[in-house]
Structure formats: C-alpha cells, structure tokens
Amino acid sequence: MAQKRLTHLRQLEAESIHIIREVAAEFSNPVMLYSIGKDSSVMLHLARKAFYPGTLPFPLLHVDTGWKFREMYEFRDRTAKAYGCELLVHKNPEGVAMGINPFVHGSAKHTDIMKTEGLKQALNKYGFDAAFGGARRDEEKSRAKERIYSFRDRFHRWDPKNQRPELWHNYNGQINKGESIRVFPLSNWTEQDIWQYIWLENIDIVPLYLAAERPVLERDGMLMMIDDNRIDLQPGEVIKKRMVRFRTLGCWPLTGAVESNSQTLPEIIEEMLVSTTSERQDRVIDRDQAGSMELKKRQGYF
C-alpha cells in the first residue's frame, strides 16, 4: 500500500488537530480563547475538523475590552451563530466601573486590567483547566520559547524556566488542583502558513485584513483607524482616507494599520513573501517596555 505524502500545510493541520483532540480527551473543562483574528479563525476551523460531524466539546471565550473594531464584533456574533458554537463573553466589571480607557490610562494599564485580569477572572469563574490560544512562535521572541502545553500556576502565572520537555509529539498534561495550561495548537505555523491555509480552506476572516479606503490618522508613528467617536484629536492631527489593511487585530486605538493595496488573499500571500517585518510591529502593547510580552505572559496574559 503506497504511503500518502502530506504537504507542509497538511502536516501542520494534522499536528494541530492531534493537539486539540489530546486536550479535549485529557482535560475535564477546556475552552477555546477566541480573539476574532485570523489565527482564531484558523484554530476554530481546525477544531471543527477535529470533531466533525459532531459539535465542539468546549465553548469559545472572548475576553472583551469594549474597544475592538465594530467589524470584529459583527464577525464574532455571526461566526458563533453560523457554526452553532457556545460563545462566552467576559468583560472585567471592575475595569468598566473604573472607566478604563486606552487613551486616558495608556496601553499597559488598559491591557493589564481589561485583558489580563479579565482573562483570569473568566478562567476562574468557569473553572477552565485548559485554554486554547492562537499564538504562534514566529510572532514574538517570548512566544518562540513557549511550549505547546504552557503550564500556569493557580494564579495563572507562567514561569519560562519551568517548562516541560515535549518530545515526539508527546505532551505531559498532568496538573495539580488549581493549576491550568494554555495550549497553542498553531505554535509551529508561520504567518505565511496561516494565510495560505485560509486561502486553501476558504476560511472566512474579518474584512479588515483586506485593503480598503479607511479613515486613519498618524499618531506616534502608527496609522490609527478611527472606528468611533471616542477619540480627541491632538493639535495638527487630520483624519484622512487611505488605502490600508491590518496584519493583526486588537483594540482599535492600539492597533496600527499598514498601507497596502492587497484586496484578495493571493495578493496578501504575495505581499507576505517579501515582507521583512513582524505582524506585531504595529501593536502598541508590544512596545510598552523591553520584554513587555514576556512580562505580560508571566502575569497571566494570553
């Protein structure tokens, strides 16, 4: 019997599906963190494949800051309804009561209270012992050294010096009461892999990833798309329509657009072939201080 050769993308797909099934079988109360971006869309697609024709054996969790793009919220609700997924949405009530605002309080405090603390609140509230995330090792150097099974203590903290070996796709999921893991099925994927797989599998994505004329202003070296009226213009700032798209999505005041004419998936794939910069270069939360992502992850960030 001839052995079937798997393409690079099919090998990645098989590995991710294996990881998702392992976690679903091994842990009592898993959840999939759904941030609405391209990686979340791929991860959800893989999870649906893993359990087809059945439904997902775990819910989706969106930790909402109240500052996502409107198109992201519309896409989130439409996707959950179309696929019949259980969608949990959590917003830090203390942060809401405090009126936490990225413009007033800055990116570091906004991220810590609305995202990190919000995530920990949700994990504690529902008692999840495993949480799938869409992080990839090629995104950022602290993520590059993180294991696929990323262990967290009872305070959801990550210790990069206390990670378990992962040999030959064998994962040790033993945890003590109160501990949990974050699981990254897309760890070995690259940004180019993600886009090629989206094109190959015809996966639906937020339209913000495709270039279009959008209202933007330049601030702190970033092209900020103005998504609503919660912004005060600084002296000399002018909102202009420019042809832009997003390589990564987050809170709109903290996520920069890139000038681009790529309006189709093949054009994006071609653009990525010659790109020499990280997709996270325009995420303000990654610029807070040196090693800011690792510090956030140590405190319980995604």
Curated annotation (Swiss-Prot):
<keyword id="KW-0548">Nucleotidyltransferase</keyword>
<comment type="similarity">
    <text>Belongs to the PAPS reductase family. CysD subfamily.</text>
</comment>
<dbReference type="InterPro" id="IPR014729">
    <property type="entry name" value="Rossmann-like_a/b/a_fold"/>
</dbReference>
<dbReference type="GO" id="GO:0005524">
    <property type="term" value="F:ATP binding"/>
</dbReference>
<keyword id="KW-0067">ATP-binding</keyword>
<dbReference type="GO" id="GO:0070814">
    <property type="term" value="P:hydrogen sulfide biosynthetic process"/>
</dbReference>
<keyword id="KW-0547">Nucleotide-binding</keyword>
<comment type="subunit">
    <text>Heterodimer composed of CysD, the smaller subunit, and CysN.</text>
</comment>
<dbReference type="InterPro" id="IPR002500">
    <property type="entry name" value="PAPS_reduct_dom"/>
</dbReference>
<dbReference type="Pfam" id="PF01507">
    <property type="entry name" value="PAPS_reduct"/>
</dbReference>
<dbReference type="InterPro" id="IPR011784">
    <property type="entry name" value="SO4_adenylTrfase_ssu"/>
</dbReference>
<dbReference type="GO" id="GO:0000103">
    <property type="term" value="P:sulfate assimilation"/>
</dbReference>
<keyword id="KW-0808">Transferase</keyword>
<comment type="function">
    <text>With CysN forms the ATP sulfurylase (ATPS) that catalyzes the adenylation of sulfate producing adenosine 5'-phosphosulfate (APS) and diphosphate, the first enzymatic step in sulfur assimilation pathway. APS synthesis involves the formation of a high-energy phosphoric-sulfuric acid anhydride bond driven by GTP hydrolysis by CysN coupled to ATP hydrolysis by CysD.</text>
</comment>
<dbReference type="InterPro" id="IPR050128">
    <property type="entry name" value="Sulfate_adenylyltrnsfr_sub2"/>
</dbReference>
<dbReference type="GO" id="GO:0004781">
    <property type="term" value="F:sulfate adenylyltransferase (ATP) activity"/>
</dbReference>
<protein>
    <recommendedName>
        <fullName>Sulfate adenylyltransferase subunit 2</fullName>
        <ecNumber>2.7.7.4</ecNumber>
    </recommendedName>
</protein>
<comment type="pathway">
    <text>Sulfur metabolism; hydrogen sulfide biosynthesis; sulfite from sulfate: step 1/3.</text>
</comment>
